[in-house]
């Protein structure tokens, strides 16, 4: 069966703050710098991202208990950016690459689906929401005349940047 442990953003924020100055942060930052290379668009936030990654990994370790598998589902907006000072997409991508499926928007079913896909395929899985409402101005600016697609042929694949780095060009904005 599936068990869900619910924790508030405040619990997460408290755990995050307790990791401030953690001696493991510099090693994670170095790993991120090497991984991102030229895609490191915001080097100044890497220490906070490393702090957040350690927070989540320690959270998993401390809450896993007898369970064999763990997934994470978070809420990354609207207060996340203002309170934590960053968006979690890159860290979520890294955790997904390490075999811990992560979804945003409190998408519990999506996280479970990613986990099932991972077990079935023995590979990292990303689910993207298909949104058929590509704005006309975006179509005109980015697609029309450049590619042989009509507006009706286009869609948006979206899921907050949790796509594993092997699936896209790696940079810290981390969007497909």
Over which residues does each language-model region extend?
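Hydrophobic alpha/beta core scaffold segments
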Residues: 40-169
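Surface-exposed, flexible loop/turn segments at secondary-structure boundaries
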Residues: 12, 80, 176
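Single conserved hydrophobic/aromatic residue that forms the stacking wall/gate
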Residues: 170-176
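Metallocofactor- and cofactor-centric catalytic cores in central/energy metabolism, strongly enriched
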Residues: 2-71
